[in-house]
Design a protein with these regions (language model features):
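N-terminal secretion-targeting helices of virulence/extracellular proteins
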Residues: 1-86
Length: 86
C-alpha cells in the first residue's frame, strides 16, 4: 500500500474515533434526559426527580448532533479531496 494510502486509512480511523466519542456524548445526554423525565413523572428516581437542569441537558443534544454532522461533512470533504488527488 502506498504511503499516502496508509495516511488516508489512519486519518479515516481517527475520524471514526471522533465520531464515536461524539455519539457517546449524545447518548449519555439523551439517557440523562430520559432519567429526568422518568423521575419528574413519578417513575423510578433517576438522579434528578425535580427536573432541575432538564432544559440545560436537553439543550446539549442538538449541539452534539450538530458536532456529528460537522465531523461527517469534514470527513466526506477530505475523502473527496483525497480521491481527486489520486
Amino acid at each position: 500500500m502506498r504511503e499516502e494510502h496508509v495516511g488516508a486509512v489512519h486519518a479515516a480511523k481517527e475520524k471514526i474515533g471522533e465520531i464515536q466519542a461524539i455519539l457517546a456524548g449524545a447518548t449519555d445526554a439523551a439517557e440523562e434526559m430520559i432519567g429526568v423525565v422518568v423521575g419528574a413523572t413519578g417513575g423510578e428516581n433517576c438522579g434528578d426527580p425535580s427536573g432541575r437542569g432538564a432544559f440545560e441537558r436537553a439543550a446539549r443534544v442538538p449541539d452534539l448532533i450538530n458536532d456529528v454532522y460537522a465531523t461527517l461533512v469534514e470527513t466526506v470533504n477530505e475523502l473527496d479531496a483525497y480521491l481527486l488527488g489520486i
